[in-house]
Design a protein with these regions (language model features):
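Feature detects long, helix-prone N-terminal segments enriched in hydrophobes
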Residues: 1-7, 180, 209, 213-214
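Short, membrane-interfacial amphipathic segments enriched in basic
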Residues: 1-10, 98-106
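Residue-level signature of catalytic and energy-coupling elements of molecular machines
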Residues: 18, 36, 69, 85, ...
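Lipid-exposed faces of alpha-helical membrane segments in multi-pass integral membrane proteins
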Residues: 23-40, 129, 133-139, 176-180
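Predominantly long cytosolic amphipathic alpha-helical stalk/bundle segments
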Residues: 51-159, 186-232
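Hydrophobic alpha-helical transmembrane segments and adjacent short intramembrane/lumenal linkers
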Residues: 156-170
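Hydrophobic alpha-helical transmembrane segments of polytopic membrane proteins
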Residues: 168-186
């Protein structure tokens, strides 16, 4: 019962606040909705993709040839690790033709960088929202205090009736700013940690393919040299 009365009191303070305070609260509310939507969306996707990477890496442990890797890639072509494998194998074929493992490693790094860049999409919104929400809360605090001093000047009195509305506006906007900023900052850091974990899995995938491409090129080199000697 007391909790319901407290909620009604807070809502009453928001309703009775001035236009500027309502605008700050409305902005913070929309920022909170956007941050939670982005955070849940990114966390769900990252969890799915990390699980896919673990499964593909487990299958890759059984592979000993590029042909077996190609089979794994074709079976998982609709997943993120499957897409990365297809791209790596495509560049691996070119590396075998040009006999340039350095070029393949550069291309593999570029593929992973592009994937990670896409995975980081929308996450800056969380860090920006955390900073902006804090500043909006501070702005609301200052605005509420100014409002309180204006009422003191108008009423020529510093009693609680005069200053309470301004002080309540200041405290409400401060709390609202923190309620938006803290989860946004926590989500941003946690998502960054998940992206680093995904990066580790993709690098492991790339390293496995790189080793196989290098081994394939090593096997091809003696054969090419033998054909060259025969032609001479």
């Amino acid at each position: 019962m007391s909790e319901m009365m407290g909620n009604n009191a807070v809502w009453g303070l928001i309703v009775q606040s001035d236009f500027m305070t309502k605008m700050v609260m409305l902005t913070l509310f929309f920022m909170s909705v956007i941050c939670w939507a982005i955070a849940l969306y990114k966390l769900i996707l990252l969890r799915i993709k990390q699980k896919q990477c673990r499964e593909v890496l487990h299958e890759m442990r059984k592979c000993t040839t590029l042909q077996e890797v190609l089979q794994v890639a074709s079976e998982n072509k609709k997943t993120l690790p499957g897409y990365v494998l297809v791209q790596l194998l495509s560049h691996g074929k070119n590396a075998q033709e040009t006999n340039s493992i350095e070029l393949f490693q550069f291309q593999a790094d570029s593929i992973i960088d592009d994937v990670l860049y896409q995975e980081e999409a929308y996450t800056p919104v969380l860090t920006i929202s955390a900073s902006v929400a804090t500043l909006l809360g501070l702005f609301g605090t200052v605005w509420g205090l100014i409002h309180a001093f204006v009422r003191i000047s108008e009423k020529q009195s510093a009693d609680i009736v005069a200053v309470a509305p301004g002080i309540s506006e200041a405290l409400i906007t401060t709390i609202a700013g923190l309620v938006v900023a803290i989860p946004a900052l926590v989500f941003a850091q946690y998502i960054a940690l998940k992206i680093r974990s995904l990066e580790h899995s993709l690098v492991s995938l790339s390293d496995k393919v790189t080793v196989m491409v290098r081994m394939s090129m090593t096997k091809q080199s003696p054969a090419v040299q033998h054909k060259s000697d025969e032609s001479i």
